Amino acid sequence: LKFLEAVTHPRIGCLLQEQIELLLQQGAPAAVLDAPVMLKAGWDAMCDAIWFVDAPRPTRLQRALQRGWTEAQFDAREAAQESLDEKRRKATVVIDNAGDSEATAAAVARHWRQFLDQVRTSPCVSVPSSPADR
């Protein structure tokens, strides 16, 4: 797996950067990168903000089981990514996903509006990173 990641992650990172630049040239106010290995691959360096959607392990596991995963598959998927503590530490926005989908959607919409407001008012987005500002 490490060999495969060493071969693919740099190329994927270049393609991501090209796509982001293309979107911005076309006038998109922002681009969203949804990649479970973003931190591990170093792609967070091309992001103005890092969002982490968090839920307790029992909730995450239950949702994975409902999608047909086994607990072993769930554990393997989580082990292949950065630790949850590391994701939380690097995040500029943490969204609580322990509740229902409507509550999560409302939180995402609120943070997205705030982010777009920052993008519109500043050519260089600087999102606060302290937990108190999340």
Q: What are the roles of these predicted feature ranges?
A:
Residues L1-P29:
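ATP-dependent small-molecule kinase phosphotransfer cores
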Residues A6-H9, E71, S101:
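Flexible, glycine- and charge-enriched loops at secondary-structure boundaries
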Residues E18-A30, D44-V53, R57-W69, S83-R134:
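NTP-dependent small-molecule kinase module
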Residues A31-K40:
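Switch II (G3) loop of P-loop NTPases
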Residues A80:
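Glycine-rich phosphate/nucleotide-binding loop
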